Design a protein with these regions (language model features):
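Alpha4 helix (beta4-alpha4-beta5 surface) of REC/receiver domains from two-component response regulators
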Residues: 58, 79-97
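C-terminal output helix
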Residues: 100-112
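Acidic, metal-coordinating helix/loop segments flanking the phosphotransfer/catalytic sites
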Residues: 27-44
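Hydrophobic/aromatic residues positioned on beta-strands within the core alpha/beta folds
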Residues: 73-78
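Charged docking surfaces used in two-component/phosphorelay signaling
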Residues: 15-23
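Conserved acidic carboxylate
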Residues: 8-9
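Active-site residues of response regulator receiver
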Residues: 48-49
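The feature encodes the CheY-like receiver
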Residues: 52-53
Length: 120
């Protein structure tokens, strides 16, 4: 079963993403603070790159250092569809997909399938 780690400060969003991805058959671990350790080996990390308490790009680099081979999907309310600069900056940090909030379950699942494939 593919493992996904979600890094998101907002509890409601963490819970919603966990529910959506678990229903698709993924094993999900959600954390609020971005402290993703070596024991959190994952097939994918979904990270909110804008959090008020931490600089998103710095946190992304820290998580990547702990999980160097793991692909990332970045989510944020700061991205705007069609805003090339945000996508370019995120991809320069090694992010495979960028999703602007608010997004639908369908959009999230499509991005996850694109990066790691379906759970079954």
């Amino acid at each position: 079963m593919p493992r996904i780690v979600i890094v998101e400060e907002d509890k409601l969003m963490r819970d919603l993403l966990t529910e959506w991805l678990s229903a698709e058959g993924y094993s999900v671990r959600a954390v609020a603070n971005g402290n993703v350790q070596g024991q959190d080996k994952a097939d994918l990390v979904i990270v909110d790159v804008y959090m008020p308490r931490r600089q998103g790009s710095n946190r992304l680099r820290e998580i990547q250092a702990a999980n160097p081979q793991t692909p990332f999907i970045a989510i944020s309310g700061q991205f705007r569809p069609g805003l090339a600069g945000s996508c370019t900056a995120a991809r320069a940090l090694g992010v495979r997909q960028v999703i602007a909030k608010p997004f639908s379950r369908r959009e999230l699942i499509a991005a996850v399938h694109d990066v790691i494939g379906p759970a079954h």
